[in-house]
Amino acid sequence: MDRRNPFQHHHHHHQLHHHLIQQQQLPPPPLSTTATMDPGGGGGGGERIPQWSIEETKELLAIREELDQTFMETKRNKLLWEVVAAKMADKGFVRSAEQCKSKWKNLVTRYKACETTEPDAIRQQFPFYNEIQSIFEARMQRMLWSEATEPSTSSKRKHHQFSSDDEEEEVDEPNQDINEELLSLVETQKRETEVITTSTSTNPRKRAKKGKGVASGTKAETAGNTLKDILEEFMRQTVKMEKEWRDAWEMKEIEREKREKEWRRRMAELEEERAATERRWMEREEERRLREEARAQKRDSLIDALLNRLNRDHNDDHHNQGF
């Protein structure tokens, strides 16, 4: 997170929300009729969902790069995917938020699969590798800058930012469920209070016997007890939901660390296997070179012996002719 004014940060999220509301009120634009199709396939799962074109996919990546920092700062990013869908509609591409999110996940999965592939093969198999790599590199630069400027909060921010990549697996916050529970408790208590008030007001004899002081004191005491009960129940639900959310987040973090360790182990094994293969190749080349040298030495020895014998025979013939 960059060190900008918190009021500007709040205003940025407010603009995104306002933009989404405006887009929901407008009629949807016509479908794009681009002819060039994305070789990676569409982000949807049904037959009626049109395939993603290359232009459409590039536009999605451009919008996702523009909002990447906001995605990393927001745990509940369902609203942000609505903003992405609205921006896609502005460009003439009609896609739902779920389709955009699914397409992004598929692209990230293919990007990770290309990390051990040769560069030439990457360009042929996955044409959007450079765009996604640019997004992740910009994210890493922001994290490094943030760690350099605010070291005291870097570790906490690191956990929060990396949790969004696994890419976009959301863990629901407890606030919404807690608020719904609190509203339910308030409505229930309100109905019970209305029933008690109605039953008391419909009996004039009982109302006449009670004094105003006693009635007001009882009402204040009942209201105080009700508010206390609601607050206590709210606190219990808050603690419970926060614990459940924390446990779920810790489980996902443990799973992520396991996957990362497994990936590193496999990469180390592949590197060792590659080094062993290279050593075996070098040993075979050395053996072949030694065999070639031995054969060359034998050939030279045979040639020398043959030449010496021919010279001796020639000298003997010449000597015999002299006699």
Curated annotation (Swiss-Prot):
Keywords: DNA-binding, Nucleus, Transcription, Transcription regulation. Residues 1-20 have a biased composition (Basic residues). GO terms for molecular function: DNA-binding transcription factor activity; identical protein binding; sequence-specific DNA binding; transcription cis-regulatory region binding. One of its GO terms (cellular component) is nucleus. Residues 164-176 have a biased composition (Acidic residues). InterPro entries: Myb_DNA-bind_4 (IPR044822), SANT/Myb (IPR001005). CDD domains: GT1. It is found in: Nucleus. Residues 52-108 form the Myb-like domain. Its main location: nucleus. Predominantly expressed in roots and flower buds. GO terms for biological process: regulation of DNA-templated transcription. Residues 1-51, 147-176, 190-220, 269-297 are annotated as: Disordered. Probable transcription factor that binds specifically to the core DNA sequence 5'-GTTAC-3'. Homodimer. Heterodimer with GT-3B. PANTHER family: FI21293P1, TRIHELIX TRANSCRIPTION FACTOR GT-3A. This is Trihelix transcription factor GT-3a. It comes from Arabidopsis thaliana.
